[in-house]
């Protein structure tokens, strides 16, 4: 009995103590468990490292604490004394002894209380959410009670068990309206509490209990709204990602189209061939027998041995001799023409 009370106090403490099975991790138990794992691995023909759990250990042996616990068969377990479950489900308010002030979410297993209204006779106060068109004329319940109007009905069932009521959007619109009414009721009941406390501070406990019920219902309705909020947020994220992908695709296609036009423009540029050069013309560079320039605007090619320089691509850098300056000038004219086409396309 004393051990049970000690265990319960340890689980309920703010900082729980380490589990008591840490005492089972002794050198002798570790050695015995290693031998059992080795024997189990040799019997089943698997490596020892792959053995996670050895079944059929004696229940009264300390060796069962040296291996991880078995998976919960029913999907439930206890953690620090609190029950845990693999199924994420919202517990109904009725299971916690809290009165529900509005209709349950269609399809849920919770049931609303009769008339979904809570009225106190002592202070003539109410925790029923007020409607949008309710205009309270007095904050003091002893002078004028708050009017009570029914909440919007939940979806009704059609013959055959099918829901003839609202769709998912209408359902969550109803929750939105219910949240709005709860918030107005919270403000009204808070003002009533201030009025009661100003007249008789000892009589404010009932109104404080009403406020607690309203807050718990408000929080519960918010939790019922979470799945819808998660779906809407996921839809928004997917839509943003789709828009981003479409924008990137359009930008890539635009760049590809510009590159195609640039290549077409470069293909239309005419570059004079060497055969078109007037080798024997009369120009400024000399007389008979010398390489001069005629009407052609292209320099006369000079044998490579006649001048020095380094060939880079389709030109020579640092050349000297006859025609070197004109050849350099013509090269940069061709380069400028090509870059002009690029600038015009990407401007």
UniProtKB/Swiss-Prot annotation:
- Report the principal subcellular site: nucleus
Alphabetized, the UniProt keywords read: Activator, Nucleus, Transcription, Transcription regulation
List where Low complexity composition bias occurs.
108-171, 302-312
The SS bond pairs are: none
GO CC list: core mediator complex; mediator complex
**Record localization:** Nucleus
Report if keyword Transcription regulation is assigned. Answer: yes
An example Gene Ontology biological process: regulation of transcription by RNA polymerase II
Q: Which GO molecular function terms does the record list?
A: transcription coregulator activity
Top-level taxon in the UniProt lineage: Eukaryota
Q: Which Pfam families match?
A: Med7 (PF05983)
Q: Which InterPro entries match?
A: Med7/Med21-like, Mediatior_Med7, Mediatior_Med7_sf
Q: Where is this region: Disordered?
A: 97-172, 302-326
Assigned protein family: Belongs to the Mediator complex subunit 7 family.
| Purpose of the protein | Component of the Mediator complex, a coactivator involved in the regulated transcription of nearly all RNA polymerase II-dependent genes. Mediator functions as a bridge to convey information from gene-specific regulatory proteins to the basal RNA polymerase II transcription machinery. Mediator is recruited to promoters by direct interactions with regulatory proteins and serves as a scaffold for the assembly of a functional preinitiation complex with RNA polymerase II and the general transcription factors.
Its subunit composition reads: Component of the Mediator complex.
PANTHER family xref list? MEDIATOR OF RNA POLYMERASE II TRANSCRIPTION SUBUNIT 7
Give the protein name, as stated in the record. Answer: Mediator of RNA polymerase II transcription subunit 7
- Which organism's genome codes for this protein? Neurospora crassa (strain ATCC 24698 / 74-OR23-1A / CBS 708.71 / DSM 1257 / FGSC 987)
């Amino acid at each position: 009995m004393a051990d049970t009370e000690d265990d319960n106090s340890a689980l309920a403490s703010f900082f729980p103590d380490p589990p008591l099975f840490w005492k089972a991790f002794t050198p002798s138990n570790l050695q015995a468990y290693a031998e059992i794992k080795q024997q189990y691995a040799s019997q089943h023909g698997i490596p020892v490292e792959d053995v996670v759990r050895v079944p059929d250990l004696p229940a009264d042996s300390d060796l069962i604490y040296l291996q991880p616990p078995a998976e919960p068969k029913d999907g439930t377990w206890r953690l620090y004394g609190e029950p845990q479950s693999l199924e994420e489900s919202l517990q109904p308010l009725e299971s916690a002894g809290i009165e529900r002030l509005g209709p349950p979410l269609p399809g849920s297993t919770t049931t609303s209380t009769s008339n979904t209204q809570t009225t106190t006779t002592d202070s003539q106060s109410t925790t029923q959410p007020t409607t949008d068109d309710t205009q309270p004329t007095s904050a003091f319940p002893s002078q004028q009670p708050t009017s009570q109007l029914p909440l919007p009905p939940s979806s009704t069932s059609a013959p055959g068990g099918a829901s003839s009521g609202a769709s998912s959007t209408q359902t969550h619109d109803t929750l939105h309206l219910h949240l709005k009414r709860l918030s107005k009721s919270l403000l009204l009941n808070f003002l009533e509490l201030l009025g009661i406390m100003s007249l008789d501070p000892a009589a404010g406990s009932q109104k404080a209990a009403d406020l607690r019920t309203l807050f718990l219902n408000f929080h519960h309705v918010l939790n019922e709204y979470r799945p819808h909020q998660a779906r809407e947020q996921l839809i928004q994220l997917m839509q943003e990602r789709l828009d981003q992908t479409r924008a990137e695709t359009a930008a890539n296609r635009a760049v590809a189209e510009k590159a195609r036009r640039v290549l077409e423009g470069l293909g239309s540029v005419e570059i004079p061939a060497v055969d078109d050069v007037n080798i024997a013309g009369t120009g400024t560079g000399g007389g008979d027998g010398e390489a001069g320039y005629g009407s052609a605007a292209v320099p006369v090619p000079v044998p490579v041995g006649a001048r020095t320089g380094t060939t880079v691509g389709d030109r020579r850098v640092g050349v000297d001799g006859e025609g070197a300056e004109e050849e350099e000038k013509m090269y940069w004219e061709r380069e400028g023409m090509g870059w002009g086409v690029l600038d015009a396309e990407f401007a």
